[in-house]
C-alpha cells in the first residue's frame, strides 16, 4: 500500500480587511477555504488554477509560513498543526521539521539576497541547522551546485552575475542541501524563458529520482502539470473542485471549470482551438464570493441548487473527487 507523506485536511486561511478607508465594517477574505488532499510518498502532486485562486497561500500555509485559520496538516506521520484541537509544533520543533520540508520560490530574482554571495546563500540552511560550517559547508554547497548544473566557483559570485535560469538552479541547490523529503515548487519555472523551462523541469525530475523526493507543484501551466505530475488538484477561488490522477483528470475533466482550463492549453490543432471553452464573466471577489457553488456565476450548466448549496468534494470513483452538483448530467 502506498504511504502518504502529507495529509491536508479542511485547511483554511482567512484574512479580515476593512471595507473602506473610513468604514468600521470589515470583510473576510477566504483565501484558502476548506482545502483537503493527500500526497503519496515519492509522487509529484500538482495544484493548478488561475492566478489569485489561493494556490501559493495554500503552499505557505502548509509549511506554517502563514498562520492557518483552520484545519490540520500532517507530515510524515507527525502533526504539524491541528487548529481545532489546538495542537501545534513548537517553534524549535517546526524549525527542525522545515529541514525536511523545503520550498522553491517563483521569482529567481527576488528570492536571492543580492548582498550575499552564492556560497552564503546556499550554506545558510546548513549553518542554521548546525549541519556543517566553514569549508565543510562550502564543499556541500559546491556539490549541490554541481548537481544543479553550476560550477563550483559559483560560490564566490553574487546573484546579479547569473541569468534567471541559473538563479533558479541556485534556489534549487539551496533547497536540496538540507536533504529534504518534500519540496514545494511555487511556480518554479513560470518566470523563465521557454527554452530554460524544459532544462529546469528535467533537472527537477532527475533530482526527484536520485533523492526519492516528493513534490507539491503550484502552477497555472497545465501543459507542464500534465507532463510532470502524478496527481492533480484543480483550485477555484480558494477551494478545490476536482482531484484525480493526472492522466485520468486530463481525459475525464468532469468539472466545467476544469474543462475550460484544459481547453485553453495552447495547441496547433485548429479543431481543438475551434472548440475552446470561453468562460463568461470575471472571477468573483474572494471577499464577496457568490452563495452556493463559487463557480455558478460563470457556469453554463448552473441550476437552482448551484446557487443555494455549496457542493461537497465527493469521491465519484476510486481516488477521483469532484465538487459539482451536476457533474453526472454534464458528462
Where are these regions (language model features)?
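Conserved ABC ATPase "signature" region
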Residues: 79-82, 136-153
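Conserved ABC transporter NBD signature motif
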Residues: 71-84
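P-loop NTP-binding/switch modules centered on Walker-like glycine-rich loops
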Residues: 50, 188, 192, 196-274
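Conserved ABC ATPase signature
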Residues: 158-162, 166
Amino acid at each position: 500500500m502506498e504511504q502518504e507523506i502529507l495529509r491536508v485536511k479542511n485547511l483554511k486561511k482567512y484574512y479580515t480587511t476593512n471595507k473602506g478607508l473610513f468604514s468600521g465594517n470589515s470583510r473576510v477574505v477566504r483565501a484558502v477555504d476548506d482545502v483537503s488532499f493527500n500526497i503519496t510518498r515519492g509522487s509529484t502532486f500538482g495544484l493548478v488554477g488561475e492566478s489569485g485562486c489561493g494556490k501559493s497561500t495554500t503552499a505557505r500555509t502548509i509549511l506554517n509560513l502563514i498562520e492557518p485559520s483552520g484545519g490540520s496538516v500532517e507530515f510524515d506521520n507527525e502533526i504539524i498543526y491541528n487548529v481545532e484541537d489546538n495542537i501545534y509544533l513548537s517553534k524549535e520543533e517546526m524549525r527542525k521539521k522545515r529541514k525536511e520540508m523545503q520550498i522553491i520560490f517563483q521569482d529567481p530574482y527576488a528570492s536571492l539576497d543580492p548582498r550575499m554571495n552564492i556560497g552564503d546563500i546556499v550554506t545558510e540552511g546548513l549553518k542554521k541547522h548546525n549541519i556543517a560550517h566553514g569549508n565543510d559547508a562550502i564543499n556541500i554547497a559546491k556539490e549541490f551546485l554541481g548537481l544543479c548544473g553550476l560550477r563550483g566557483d559559483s560560490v564566490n559570485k553574487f546573484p546579479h552575475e547569473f541569468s534567471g535560469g541559473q538563479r533558479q538552479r541556485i534556489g534549487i541547490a539551496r533547497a536540496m542541501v538540507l536533504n529534504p523529503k518534500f519540496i514545494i515548487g511555487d511556480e518554479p519555472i513560470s518566470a523563465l524563458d521557454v527554452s530554460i523551462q524544459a532544462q529546469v523541469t528535467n533537472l527537477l525530475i532527475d533530482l526527484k529520482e536520485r533523492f526519492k523526493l516528493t513534490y507539491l507543484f503550484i502552477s497555472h501551466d497545465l501543459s507542464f502539470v500534465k507532463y510532470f505530475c502524478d496527481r492533480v488538484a484543480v483550485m477555484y477561488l480558494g477551494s478545490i473542485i476536482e482531484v484525480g490522477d493526472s492522466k485520468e483528470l486530463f481525459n475525464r475533466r468532469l468539472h466545467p471549470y476544469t474543462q475550460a482550463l484544459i481547453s485553453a492549453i495552447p495547441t496547433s490543432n485548429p479543431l481543438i482551438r475551434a472548440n475552446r471553452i470561453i468562460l463568461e464573466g470575471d472571477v468573483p471577489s474572494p471577499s464577496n464570493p457568490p452563495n452556493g457553488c463559487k463557480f455558478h456565476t460563470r457556469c453554463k450548466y448552473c441550476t437552482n441548487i448551484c446557487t443555494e448549496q455549496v457542493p461537497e468534494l465527493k469521491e465519484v470513483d476510486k481516488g477521483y473527487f469532484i465538487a459539482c452538483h451536476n457533474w453526472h448530467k454534464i458528462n
